[in-house]
Amino acid sequence: MATTKQNIEVERIQTGVRIEKRLLKVLKAVAELKDMTLGDLLEGIVLHAFEGKSAFSAASLKEIEQLKKLYGMTLQSSDSHHLKERR
């Protein structure tokens, strides 16, 4: 028997972050596919990561691979913390 989780009231704040251009394009496209805001998508990804879980199903990961190709995003997790901004 599935249980329905109650909505949890939170306080959100506006923040400005700098993020790699192609990565942002992919994230926005994923949010659009999932019919959610970019903020909701990012919260979900981070909360899953904090628990060592994947935020995406196998089907979603296939869609993300297609979006990465579409937007020319070649970065991988091993590239994190090694990105240098162009001047």
Regions found by a protein language model. Give the residues of each.
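Short interaction-prone segments
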Residues: A55-M73
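Surface-exposed, Lys/Arg-rich phosphate-binding patches that contact polyanionic backbones
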Residues: Q6-N7, I13, K21-D40, G44
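Generic detector of low-complexity/intrinsically disordered segments
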Residues: K25-V26, E43, A49, E63, ...
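Short, basic amphipathic alpha-helical segments that act as recognition/interaction helices
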Residues: K34-L61
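Short Lys/Arg-rich basic patches
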Residues: M1-K21, K69-S78, H82-R87
